[in-house]
């Protein structure tokens, strides 16, 4: 597995280990903070990077299945070059190494950001393919182009499935990735936008990936999304679970332009990813719904975790970790 130290990778490793599977995971510098010592010891760790094609090839010796979860998630325009290099070139390296090493199947973690936006006021599904639009983020473009590398691999004989999760809720380092949403709720970030989108529990993403890997399914991509919710509702529930004040100041499009600039300056001073960028300020003003019927059709017994339960579970785990350390 690549990306074993990230949000999806950590929970995927936990599921694979709990099922008694033999797992080899790539890591760059540190083991996942949210895995137990016992879980870490059950995994064969290989130090490496998806940008090191030579090391990737050797790490796949004897491997039959590959989960590719390594990616950079950033909406900071100043990281575009880094974003494209890791997400596109990294995926190409994983696909090439898999083919050369005789890997039988790959499950690739993409994103709903890589889906098209052609039909107005219609839930997005897997038939809507990418078109160049100003509303597309650099991150979404990088994930779309990384998908093309996986499709190329499938065309060259590699079995593969692509999963496109919506906004993932899970316990992880809340200074990075989508877990920053929980940190902002804990810190009583006062602003909210009128928009919304799809949400899914990270445990469901992991469960779907393992199920697709084991199933006789290839050459397909699937939206993995439990519910469509407004951002204000989700942030309010997070704040309530933390015992904090929920967001109370509505961000108009004009005000969003001011807020993202303030957040940008704060991020420079703190040397951290900004909570709000020009891209996220723009997309946060609209409700984008996602259709999850294809996954249900291929996996009739698959059950999603209700988002309210996901929020409750994640807040509980984060409080346990950060308020006791």
Language model regions located:
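N-terminal Rossmann NAD(P)H-binding glycine-rich loop of SDR-like oxidoreductase domains
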Residues: 1-19
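NAD(P)H-binding glycine-rich loop region in Rossmannoid oxidoreductase-like domains
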Residues: 32, 43-89, 97
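Conserved catalytic-site region of short-chain dehydrogenase/reductase
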Residues: 75, 112-122, 168-174
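Conserved Rossmann-fold NAD(P)-dependent oxidoreductase catalytic core, especially the SDR/UDP-sugar
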Residues: 81, 86-138
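Substrate-positioning beta->alpha
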Residues: 93, 145, 176-177, 193-214, ...
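Active-site Tyr-X1-5-Lys
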Residues: 134-161
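NAD(P)-dependent short-chain dehydrogenase/reductase
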Residues: 157-199
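Mid/C-terminal beta-alpha module of Rossmann-like enzyme folds, strongest
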Residues: 208-275, 292, 297, 306-307, ...
């Amino acid at each position: 597995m690549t990306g074993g130290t990230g949000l999806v990778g950590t929970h995927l490793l936990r599921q694979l280990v709990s099922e008694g599977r033999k797992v080899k995971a790539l890591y760059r510098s540190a083991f996942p903070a949210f895995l137990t010592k016992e879980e870490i010891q059950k995994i064969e760790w290989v130090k490496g990077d998806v940008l090191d094609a030579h090391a990737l090839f050797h790490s796949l010796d004897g491997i039959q299945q590959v989960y590719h979860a390594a990616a950079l998630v950033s909406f900071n325009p100043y990281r575009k070059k880094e974003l494209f290099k890791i997400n596109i070139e990294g995926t190409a390296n994983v696909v090439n190494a898999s083919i050369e090493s005789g890997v039988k199947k790959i499950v690739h973690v993409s994103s709903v950001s890589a889906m098209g936006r052609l039909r107005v006021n219609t839930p997005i599904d897997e038939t809507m393919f990418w078109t160049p639009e100003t509303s597309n983020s650099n991150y979404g473009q990088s994930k779309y182009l990384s998908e093309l590398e996986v499709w190329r691999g499938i065309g060259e004989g590699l079995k593969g499935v692509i999963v496109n999760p919506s906004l993932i809720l899970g316990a992880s380092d809340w200074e990075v990735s989508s877990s920053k949403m929980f940190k902002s709720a804990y810190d009583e970030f006062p602003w909210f936008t009128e928009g919304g989108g799809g949400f899914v529990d990270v445990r469901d993403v992991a469960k779907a990936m393992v199920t697709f890997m084991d199933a006789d399914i290839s050459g397909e991509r699937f939206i993995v999304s439990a519910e469509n919710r407004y951002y204000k509702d989700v942030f309010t529930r997070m704040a309530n679970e933390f015992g904090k004040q929920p967001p109370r100041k509505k961000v108009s499009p004009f005000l969003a332009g001011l807020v993202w600039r303030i957040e940008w300056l704060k991020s420079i001073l703190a040397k951290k990813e900004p909570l709000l960028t020009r891209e996220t300020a723009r997309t946060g003003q609209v409700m984008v719904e996602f259709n999850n019927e294809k996954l249900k059709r291929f996996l009739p017994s698959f059950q999603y975790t209700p988002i309210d339960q996901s929020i409750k579970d994640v807040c509980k785990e984060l409080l346990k970790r950060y308020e006791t350390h």
